């Protein structure tokens, strides 16, 4: 059995695990990622996905003259997801997500070379009760596979990659 020693242990080499590892390496921490698969297959379910990402008041929405806001997105999310303050952490998480997704996700990945098809998708509109009131789903150019490949490559080529162990 291999033994690892690091400041941070991350379970799972999906997108969240890869991004967490990148951030930890940036912070000077040593990192071990433990996954059921080999590093070449990291990316989790995102690697197999169509690549849709939910952003609020994004540059692509503004270019298309789609007026959106975190308040509007949260109202839509609560309607479609049937969330209320009684849902506690899920409700709070959804609120923070719509407030921060463009700045903390979109603006994090686009400098890495991730781009989006110039068409916004309007999913989860709701059949029996209202859902998204404007298009918010951005499709990664190259699908989720491209997202996983770009992030995985950034991880493997990181300046502190010697502080990274994959198990």
What are these regions (language model features)?
Residues 19, 29, 38, 101-102:
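Proteins synthesized as precursors that undergo proteolytic processing into mature forms
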Residues 1-5:
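A short, basic/flexible loop-to-alpha-helix module at the beginning of a structural domain
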Residues 26-47:
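Glycine-rich FAD pyrophosphate-binding loop
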Residues 48-53, 136:
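Short, hinge-like loop/turn segments at secondary-structure boundaries
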Residues 52-98:
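Glycine-rich active-site loop/strand segments that organize a redox cofactor
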Residues 6-33:
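N-terminal Rossmann-like FAD-binding beta1-loop-alpha1 element of flavoenzymes
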Residues 94-167:
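Conserved redox-cofactor binding core of oxidoreductases
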Residues 13, 36-37, 57-58:
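Active-site-proximal beta-strand/loop segments in catalytic clefts of secreted hydrolases
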């Amino acid at each position: 059995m291999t033994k690892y020693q690091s400041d941070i242990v991350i379970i799972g080499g999906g997108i969240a695990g890869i991004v967490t590892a990148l951030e930890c390496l940036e912070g000077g921490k040593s990192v071990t990622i433990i996954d059921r698969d080999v590093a070449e297959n990291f990316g989790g379910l995102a690697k197999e996905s169509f690549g849709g990402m939910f952003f609020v008041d994004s540059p692509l929405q503004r270019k298309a003259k789609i007026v959106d806001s975190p308040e509007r997105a949260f109202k839509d999310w609560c309607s479609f997801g049937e969330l209320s303050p009684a849902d506690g952490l899920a409700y709070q998480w959804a609120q923070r997500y719509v407030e921060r997704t463009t700045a903390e996700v979109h603006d994090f990945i686009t400098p890495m070379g991730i781009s989006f098809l110039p068409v916004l998708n309007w999913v989860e509109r709701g059949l029996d009760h209202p859902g998204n009131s404007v298009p918010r789903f951005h499709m990664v150019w190259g699908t989720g596979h491209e997202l996983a490949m770009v992030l995985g490559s950034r991880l493997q080529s990181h300046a502190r990659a010697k502080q990274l162990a994959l198990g």
